[in-house]
């Protein structure tokens, strides 16, 4: 037997231990049902395998009465284990804990630490105040298990307050117990995993659910050429032969190749309504099933019938593990639904210009054992269009997408829909995203908030408490972006260098609606920048190009071309996006002071460096008019679009932080030990100043 065979056996045994531990430590989740029928999950427990081999398992749950979070770590070592919480995945400024069971005494140890302030400043530093309480610890010949807890907010400037945001959870495994005074984090294995600590997670437990079947849907030999920066590929598939209605209970990604090198950015599986257009040939669908697929959203290559593939049933984005639904909900398939065909859409992002061949897709888990409710997925947010504009050089700039009464009053049932979960989606510039909820002129608690959004880690936000959205309510997807190092405006679009602002909402009961979007009306978008007319194109033509993806050449035979200076340097992929932009083809005729400029050139000359100007533009887009769209499953656009103003409402105010000390966690001068005096002195000084101001006012 070779050394490789022995290593493989060892790894297999370790992974089997980990999976067995996972299966045996899943606590049945209790729940309450309120007067509105919403489910509130309680006593939930999360269990995550932190590495790919099952060497490190992290289990946790929240005790709301104590305002505490409990952890249990099971690690394949008799040495130390490290755990840390970070906003960006770096050791610097991370909130960390080192733990071990003493080999000599059997005593469990948990040490509260923090990362150095600079990446090159050495090992972790011990906190002055220890805020982690060890509860239990033991080890055998191979494994160490430690249980401990901490407050969600500790009021220690060197700890990070935990929240519903996406955290980068650091982990490390060491072969030996730490030597006194040596807090070196660099163990034999270490890594980072993005987690949402406040979200329960549902799983497919093979011991308790019978009759689960799987349906694998993948593309076949899709070639991503070196020259392709962005590719959207669509493939039609047919539903398997089923005996009546079934319920999809969850789905997982099937990714070809090593994950780190994979170019798949996101995937969506859509239902198709095969009889939606008059003149459609039903036999064409079976021909498309046998084909390899084609480029999506192409006027030349994509069949018009594929526009009917609009209702999502599975959504995956970079960093996600997929989703399993709670036990009372399932997405229907087969039976009387009339849906026989589905479309798999895959977005390939290839910034490094590598050639690859892909076979990715979904594994759908379904069962004939129907659940209580039919569930669905709908998309809400900003309609993907170049009328979404993010100026360059911005630390924080917001865009909003509105789903208003034109959809909710018409499509939602009397008792509303109940939101189970949501996946927030933007591209590289996205920094924070929230799904806001407005009813009767008052903003309610946000449904989902992620103030540490990372487009590389787009996990499902599973709600511990389902949210009821009633007819007449507003859903607002609110995104903020950072473009500090960009020199030109960023627009809405399909490339990761362009932007999106979307929420994929999983809910029940299922309704015949696939999407609810808004955008700045086209005419108002141009008038915002004092542009009123283009050569040989009236504004109606321009609106049609934006709203219906019409080809510019259909309207531009007499259009005047602007004189653009040739690019003498190397053309980047961003340059290509700008050159192909519709905004770069529209040449201004009115007003005269801007004539013969392309609209894109006009935007590049605006004073984006002026914060007052940029803030006015941001507020004008947010609080101005919005064109809303309600996409209904049974028709391509059966509810007319509507132009509305941003709703007036009393905004939700986030409760103040319990601890002022957290305001100083990013201070470059903050140090352990003597720095506590500096922190306390500064807080006291601020308090005295505030009291002095109050006295003056009195």
UniProtKB/Swiss-Prot annotation:
It holds the Pfam family DOMON. Keywords: Copper, Disulfide bond, Glycoprotein, Metal-binding, Monooxygenase, Oxidoreductase, Secreted, Signal. The keyword DNA-binding does not apply. GO terms for molecular function: copper ion binding; dopamine beta-monooxygenase activity. InterPro entries: Cu2_ascorb_mOase-like_C, Cu2_ascorb_mOase_CS-1, Cu2_ascorb_mOase_N, Cu2_ascorb_mOase_N_sf, Cu2_monoox_C, DBH-like, DOH_DOMON, DOMON_domain. Glycans are attached at residues 36, 140, 221, 465, 538, 561. This is MOXD1 homolog 1.
């Amino acid at each position: 037997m070779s050394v490789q065979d022995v290593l493989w056996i060892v790894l297999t045994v370790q992974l089997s231990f980990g999976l067995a531990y996972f299966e045996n430590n899943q606590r049945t989740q209790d729940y309450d049902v309120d007067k509105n029928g919403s489910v509130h999950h309680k006593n939930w427990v999360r269990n995550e395998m932190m590495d790919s081999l099952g060497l490190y398992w992290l289990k946790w749950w929240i005790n709301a009465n104590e305002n505490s979070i409990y952890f249990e770590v099971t690690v394949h070592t008799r040495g130390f284990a490290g755990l840390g919480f970070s906003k960006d995945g770096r050791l610097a400024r991370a909130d960390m804990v080192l733990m071990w069971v003493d080999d000599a005494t059997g005593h469990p140890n948990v040490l509260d630490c923090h990362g150095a302030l600079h990446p090159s400043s050495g090992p972790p530093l011990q906190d002055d105040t220890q805020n982690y309480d060890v509860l239990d610890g033991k080890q055998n010949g191979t494994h160490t298990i430690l249980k401990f807890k901490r407050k969600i907010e500790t009021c220690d400037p060197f700890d990070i307050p935990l929240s519903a945001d996406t955290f980068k959870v650091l982990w490390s495994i060491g072969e030996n117990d730490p030597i006194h005074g040596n807090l070196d984090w660099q163990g034999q294995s270490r890594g980072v995993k993005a987690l949402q600590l406040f979200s329960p997670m549902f799983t497919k437990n093979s011991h308790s659910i019978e009759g689960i079947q799987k349906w694998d849907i993948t593309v076949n030999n899709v070639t991503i050429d070196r020259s392709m920066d962005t590719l959207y590929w669509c493939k039609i598939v047919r539903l398997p032969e089923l005996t009546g209605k079934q319920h999809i209970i969850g789905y997982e990604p099937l990714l070809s190749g090593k994950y780190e090198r994979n170019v798949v950015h996101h995937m969506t599986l859509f239902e198709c309504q095969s009889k939606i257009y008059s003149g459609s040939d039903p036999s064409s669908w079976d021909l498309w099933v046998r084909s390899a697929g084609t480029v999506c959203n192409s006027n030349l290559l994509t069949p018009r019938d594929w526009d009917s593939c609009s209702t999502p049933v599975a959504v995956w984005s970079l960093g996600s593990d997929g989703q399993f639904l709670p036990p009372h909900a399932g997405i229907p398939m087969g039976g009387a639904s009339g849906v026989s065909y589905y479309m798999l859409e895959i977005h390939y992002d290839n910034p490094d210009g590598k050639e690859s061949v892909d076979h990715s897709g979904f594994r759908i888990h379904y069962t004939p054992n129907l659940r209580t409710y039919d569930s669905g997925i709908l998309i809400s947010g900003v309609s993907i269009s170049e009328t979404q504009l993010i100026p360059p050089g911005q630390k924080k700039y917001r865009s909003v997408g509105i789903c208003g009464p034109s959809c909710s009053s018409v499509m939602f049932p009397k008792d509303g829909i109940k939101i189970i979960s949501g996946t927030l989606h933007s591209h590289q510039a996205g920094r924070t995203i929230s799904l806001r909820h407005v009813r009767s002129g008052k903003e309610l608690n946000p449904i989902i908030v992620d103030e540490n959004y990372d487009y590389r880690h787009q996990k499902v936000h599973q709600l511990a408490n389902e949210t009821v959205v009633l007819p007449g309510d507003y859903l607002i997807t609110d995104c903020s972006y950072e473009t500090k190092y960009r020199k030109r405006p960023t627009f809405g679009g399909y490339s990761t260098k362009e932007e999106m602002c979307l929420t994929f909402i999983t809910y029940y009961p299922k309704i015949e609606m696939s999407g609810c979007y808004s955008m700045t009306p086209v005419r108002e978008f141009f008038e915002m920048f004092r542009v009123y007319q283009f050569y040989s194109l009236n504004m109606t033509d321009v609106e049609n190009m934006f709203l219906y993806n019409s080809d510019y050449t259909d309207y531009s035979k007499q259009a005047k071309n602007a004189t653009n200076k040739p690019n003498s340097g190397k053309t980047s992929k961003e340059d290509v996006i700008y050159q192909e932009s519709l905004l770069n083809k529209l040449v201004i005729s009115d007003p005269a002071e801007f004539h013969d400029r392309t609209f894109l050139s006009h935007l590049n000359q605006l004073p984006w460096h002026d914060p007052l100007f940029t803030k006015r533009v941001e507020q004008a887009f947010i609080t101005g008019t919005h064109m809303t769209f309600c996409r209904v499953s049974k028709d391509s656009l059966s509810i007319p679009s509507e132009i509305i103003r941003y709703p007036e409402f009393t905004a939700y105010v986030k409760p103040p932080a319990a601890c002022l000390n957290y305001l100083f966690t990013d201070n470059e001068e903050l140090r352990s030990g003597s720095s506590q005096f500096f922190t306390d002195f500064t807080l006291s000084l601020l308090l005295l100043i505030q009291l002095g101001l109050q006295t003056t006012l009195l």
